[in-house]
Amino acid sequence: SIAKPCVNLPSFYLGAVTISSQQQANSALTLALKAEARALGFSACGIAPADATPEAAARLDAWLAEGMHGDMLWMEERAGQRGSPRALWPAVKSVVMLGMSYAPAGDPLALADVRDRGRISVYAQGQDYHDIVKKALKALARWLVSRSPCDLKVFVDTAPVMEKPLAAAAGIGWQGKHSNLVSRTDGSWLFLGAIMTTLDLPPDAPHADRCGSCTA
């Protein structure tokens, strides 16, 4: 037989898709990133491209026009930035969405009829989630920069970021009729955080809307 010359190429051919060495590296980085997120206490991690929610701005404008924001004037004041990740930070390419479960160990309604016990929302029974989630986000951000130098920003609830549509676009869950994100594994018991980065990471598939016919 005649030996064929060996040619080093920057990519390999798989089926009908050519995958570059950079894409291979980013895919491996993404898998490691998700494993690190789990190690830091996050129960969900997904990635969405920065332009994954083009309909969010229009929905926000309609919501504001109906006065649904009530006294939350800051929602209107920064609506332009809130509508899109790139409106907030033009350099962003990918958004890493993260969810940290705060599901209670028992049934929170079990004490509903106990009159000598106060009722405190489950999310408020522990430490301030802003501090807990942001600490984990910063740790994950440091890990990411150490593996692949990039610019990034972390967010948890206090910046003009539409976390729920982005989390749905990142495959973590879907936005239910009650407006909250619903995860098939964690329900609505998720604190959401985001890391915007200049890295072009492979995105996850958006989560389908699985709401039924309820009118709640």
Model feature map: region roles:
Residues 14-212:
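Auxiliary alpha/beta "docking" domains used to position bulky ligands
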Residues 215:
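TRNA-recognition modules of translation machinery and tRNA-sensing kinases, especially anticodon-binding
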